[in-house]
């Protein structure tokens, strides 16, 4: 019972946070994805949502765009100190549309750095996909 209490609740308390140095990224982040298809010079911008579900022992990431959803297969959080927090993950991407001519399935990798701006948490970084796409992500925590 003590492990469960710590895993789900206690580690999020400010006093405990100051001792364990594990950042709590739990919440919903909204923002923009700016991408470039390989070989093309035009940039595309899309609205995106990242949902982070975190306990002391586990973390899951679900990334949603207008036409697809990505789920993290492997996640790494690097915490050098409270000002240098990096989140890396490998993901599978699935199509929302159901259209046969869309090629929205794939895999990829993402790296985001946590930044504080005007008291708000931001996750910013890059992604690369097996569909020869790459781009920049700029997200802000909304809950």
Question: Can you name each region flagged by the protein language model?
Answer:
Residues 1-28, 34-38, 143:
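Amphipathic/hydrophobic helical signal segments and adjacent flexible N-terminal regions
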Residues 14-15, 44-45, 106-109:
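Charged, amphipathic alpha-helical segments
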Residues 23-44, 63-65, 123-129:
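Tryptophan-anchored aromatic micro-motifs
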Residues 36-41, 68, 96-100, 132-133:
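Short, cysteine-centered beta-strand-loop-beta hairpins and adjacent loop/turn segments enriched
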Residues 41-77:
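N-terminal glycine/threonine-rich, aromatic-flanked beta-hairpin/loop signature
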Residues 51-58, 80-84, 114-122:
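Short, solvent-exposed coil/turn segments at beta-strand boundaries
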Residues 65-115:
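Contiguous, well-ordered beta-strand patches that form the walls/edges
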Residues 107-143:
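Edge beta-strand at a domain terminus
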């Amino acid at each position: 019972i003590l492990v469960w209490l710590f895993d789900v609740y206690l580690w999020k308390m400010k006093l405990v946070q100051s001792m364990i140095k594990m950042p709590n990224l739990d919440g919903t982040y909204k923002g923009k994805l700016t991408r470039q298809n390989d070989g093309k010079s035009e940039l595309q911008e899309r609205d995106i949502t990242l949902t982070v579900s975190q306990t002391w022992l586990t973390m899951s990431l679900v990334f949603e765009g207008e036409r697809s959803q990505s789920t993290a297969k492997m996640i790494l959080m690097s915490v050098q100190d409270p000002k240098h927090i990096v989140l890396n993950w490998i993901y599978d991407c699935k199509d929302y549309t159901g259209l046969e001519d869309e090629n929205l399935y794939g895999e990829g990798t993402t790296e985001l750095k946590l930044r504080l701006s005007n008291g708000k948490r931001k996750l910013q970084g890059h992604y690369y996909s097996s569909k020869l796409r790459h781009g920049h992500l700029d997200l802000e925590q909304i809950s």
